[in-house]
């Protein structure tokens, strides 16, 4: 395809949702190096995706819109939506592509942009677009969007998300790194917005103590709302740990994760961010979620999997058509990785921290991070 000046990409949701699209966005950048890539996203995208961090050149915030940008405390404004679409039509996009759902909501959105070519995912009941592939839920999210990018001949050799940690991110955590005095540290990210993806908080204190006994400093990460919960975990430890919850920006968090020798987390945004800065990870996954959200490589990433399928409250096996569905009268609000043992997580961590061949990989990565030149 020639003379492509502007490509709009719709992905207006959360951190992990965006990060898994990065290989596809990189494919678009590689294939169309002179094209402006514009993300139609949320306010956090505009704050985080500053110049140089990803292949995205510009972010335009999408107004609150059912099925596109859902906000708990936000309401739709039809006048704002109309003004948005008029503005987007004046952009004269050559291609509008969506990486968001099965097309029921996203396809009508794309068509209102009046782009020369519309591309994305679709299902039988969705509004038609120019080029599409069928949406089937159970698929690696990374590979899903690479398939979509392939509809405009975009290709890449990179199948793991990648972002750049910038100088301003390094500067933000300089005091923390000075305090640690170059001691190797492991990051634990214990909580998740969706409790069903979170490991039992009580497991983190003994895990953190084990890491301390092995010679690693321990940093906990999370949102400001999770700070108290992390304080409670630390209060049950025999050793000291650092609570960074709510104390850094998303860029600062990326810098912390990049400097860690290992990140241990449930299936949530910071785990995907750690992958994107090339830090070894131990991720705790419910088996159905691993299909979509797990890493594609294993050299420095180890998933620990829960195979416990049934909800203990109602007995339903909630994995069809999506994870945690159907709900009926039960929302299955309990951890679905609760049966993962501390021993299993330790074994996965040991495989990355202490085996000689993995240690060499860690040392190479570690020496190239913010510590040093």
Segments from the language model and where they lie:
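Catalytic machinery of carbohydrate-active enzymes
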Residues: 1-373
